[in-house]
From Swiss-Prot:
ZnF C2H2-type: positions: 33-55, 145-167
The keyword Transport appears for this protein: no
Keywords: Metal-binding, Repeat, Zinc, Zinc-finger
Region (Disordered) location: 184-203, 256-329
Protein name: Zinc finger protein 843
Annotated GO MF terms: zinc ion binding
Coiled coil region boundaries: none
Compositionally biased residues, Polar residues: 184-195
Protein source organism: Homo sapiens
Source organism superkingdom: Eukaryota
Length: 348
């Protein structure tokens, strides 16, 4: 391959744009692409551009792999990258290429100061570094003065009586030695008889609670008997006196009627109206006759009882079978009878 003239090499070009006029590969051992900063020559312009990054940005220099660290060998001490940590001078190849002293910023003291200024680290990593004490603001202040009633703490003694409002039924703390008194009987200290207790005494905060939490609870009121056991008295009649909690007074049934009641229970269940009347008679207080019922109530009792019995029979009836043509399992309902008859006629 024909070689290019020497006048077209990168030496005649400005150092700010180190490029080569040709991108071909030279096989005669010449290195026409030279770096103006360090004087190293390369056979390709791509290698020169990659090498120029060493002089332009020191951040990319720190991220170079060990294979490409040979690009840093021809660097001079005064042309070292402006790195505050000086990591580019830690490789063995770079130390071999340096013949003089290192730059002034590579000294131990200057490196430590620059590293602490740029990226602060915890104490003990670079040595005993004294950190400035944080400013004493309201969030970091110590509040040594505590109220013996509510437990709130303040930073000044005067604020204890100015900012903290006095609690109901209690006296404010004066000078840290004045006692406080509460309306609750359980808050009185066992040692004193007047109910006064010095601030900061053991158990003063736990025992000095608001009166609402220390008052005894009211006795539990048991509810009355259920409505089903209370006598049914119309609004026109006088009120029946309350039945005591010890038990219900059951009206005494005459001995002549007891055999009849036993015979009636042995014969079978009675109607709902008669059962309800008997239960009212049993719960009825002595001395009051059974309230008279209107004629309309007697008339409504019959249809309601029949409807209730009809609903019970329908609930007890078995579900319809899967085969509607099986007449033996069909219940007595006219709708299902009609449907079965139609299906039988259709089949025949």
């Amino acid at each position: 391959m024909r070689s290019l003239p020497f006048a077209l090499t990168v030496e005649s070009v400005s150092a700010r744009a180190p490029t080569c006029c040709s991108t071909g590969r030279f096989t005669q051992g010449r290195q026409p692409c030279k770096c103006k900063a360090c004087g190293r020559g390369f056979t390709q312009s791509a290698s020169l551009l990659q090498h120029w990054r060493v002089h332009s940005d020191w951040r990319e220099t720190l991220s170079l792999s060990p294979v490409r660290q040979d690009l840093l060998w021809p660097l001079q001490p005064h042309q070292a990258p402006a790195s505050p940590l000086g990591r580019s001078h830690s490789s063995a190849g770079v130390r071999q290429g340096f013949s003089g002293q290192l730059c002034c910023w590579l000294t131990k003291e200057h490196t430590l100061a620059e590293a602490l200024r740029l990226s602060p680290v915890p104490a003990g990593f670079w040595g005993p570094v004294e950190a400035d004490r944080p400013p004493a603001n309201s969030h970091r202040r110590v509040c040594p003065f505590c109220c013996c009633s509510c437990g709130d703490s303040v930073n000044e003694k005067t604020s204890l009586s100015q900012r903290v409002l006095p609690h109901p039924g209690e006296k404010t703390c004066r000078g840290g030695s004045v006692e406080s008194v509460s309306l609750a009987p359980s808050s009185v200290a066992p040692d004193s008889t007047s109910g006064l207790r010095p601030c900061g005494s053991p158990g003063s905060f736990l025992q000095h609670l608001p009166p609402s939490t220390l008052l005894p609870r009211p006795p539990f009121l048991y509810p009355g008997p259920p409505l089903s056991l209370q006598p049914l008295v119309p609004s026109g009649l006088p009120a029946v006196p309350a039945v005591p909690l010890g038990g219900l007074e059951v009206a005494q049934v005459p001995p002549a009627t007891q055999p009849a009641a036993q015979q009636e229970g042995a014969m079978g269940p009675r109607s709902c109206a008669s059962a309800g009347r008997d239960s009212r008679e049993a719960v009825q207080a002595p001395g009051y006759p059974e309230p008279a019922r209107k004629a309309s109530q007697h008339r409504a009792a019959g249809p309601l009882g029949e409807a209730r019995a009809r609903l019970q029979r329908q609930c007890r009836a078995p579900p319809p079978p899967s085969n509607p043509h099986w007449r033996g399992a069909l219940p007595v309902f006219p709708v299902w009878k009609a449907s079965s008859r139609r299906s039988n006629l259709a089949r025949h």
